[in-house]
Design a protein with these regions (language model features):
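C-terminal appended segment following the main domain
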Residues: 252-303
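Conserved alpha-helical "signature site"
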Residues: 1-192, 196-269
């Protein structure tokens, strides 16, 4: 069975929501009309973050230019320095220079850090959502997508962005309509994927994949990312492209990590075409997959 799209909406585990027996909120809004009427304020990514993301796409960018842009945002600067001084990058001496930190981390890793921090910061608090859990699961999906992309044939950065942002539509709905979110979700357990999208459609008049795709388009991320997220709760077709296969697989692995599945159980939830890229003897996962999954289990938040 293929694991569907999995935004990590985590509540107290009292009972599991089932769309067919969950009462609908008496007021169903029209999200698109509310945007047109100025009643919905979509999250905005800080200008400095947008500038950094654009600059970091240039493989020949001057690291001093990046350092100068970073210095405009003390929070991001602190995160970059903390990462540069972490055990992952050696951590043998205290590094206080942002230029040196940028050189050490590298532009690709820095771009992902800036994107993750900028996106998470743009949402602030969301009533009823366990944001640390949400962003940790999103980061695991993003990391999984990044690692899967080369074998599946997807563009690496598009895969990472898709994994990171795939559940943001749910945050937007809950932040925009907190009364409906409270009515529908309070007191219920984890709700994921197509099940969550069905409940959202019934109560909000739209689901998180469509909201997330709309937001991604407004902030100027690549169209393939928006299209892939828009289709993420639909049944996976035989003609699914590399980016869609990568996102579905990444979400399956993020859900497996949340359930504390063993590697073999996580592997069994991948689409067959992706399993074939990592298959060992007898249909079991190979050493590369086991190493990938172990790394996902050890993922620490950097937001």
């Amino acid at each position: 069975m293929i694991e569907p799209h999995t935004p990590a909406y985590t509540l107290e585990p009292t009972k599991r929501v089932v769309a067919n027996d969950q009462p609908s909120h008496p007021r169903t809004p029209n999200f698109i009309n509310d945007i047109a009427a100025g009643k919905v304020e979509l999250p905005t990514i800080p200008r400095v973050v947008q500038q950094l993301i654009t600059a970091l796409r240039d493989p020949d960018v001057d690291t001093r230019k990046i350092g100068a842009a970073l210095s405009q945002d003390p929070v991001l600067t602190a995160k970059v320095l903390r990462l540069a001084n972490s055990a992952f990058f050696g951590g043998q001496r205290s590094m206080a220079s942002i230029d040196a930190a940028v050189s050490l981390i590298g532009t690709q890793a820095l771009g992902r850090l800036v994107l993750a921090g900028g996106v998470a910061g743009s949402f602030g608090t969301v009533p009823g959502i366990d944001l640390p859990t949400f962003w940790r699961d999103s980061l695991i999906a993003a990391t999984a997508a990044q690692k899967l992309a080369p074998r599946v044939g997807a563009e690496v950065e598009e895969a990472y962005v898709s994994g990171l942002l795939h559940g943001t539509g749910h945050l937007i709905l809950c932040k925009t309509y907190p009364d409906i979110a409270d009515f529908v979700f309070t007191g219920y357990a984890v709700v994921r994927g197509a099940e969550l999208a069905t409940i959202e459609q019934e109560n909000f008049g739209i689901d998180h994949p469509n909201v997330g795709a709309l937001w991604i388009e407004t902030i100027g991320f690549p169209q393939p990312v928006a299209d892939t997220i828009r289709n993420a709760a639909q049944p996976l077709s035989g003609s699914a492209g590399p980016l869609e296969l990568t996102l579905r697989s990444a979400c399956a692995l993020a859900a497996a990590v949340a359930r504390k599945d063993e590697a073999a159980a996580a592997f069994a939830r991948l689409p067959p075409v992706v399993q074939a890229r990592y298959g060992g003897a007898g249909g079991a996962p190979d050493a590369a997959f086991e190493k990938l999954y172990e790394a996902l289990q050890e993922t620490e938040p950097t937001m």
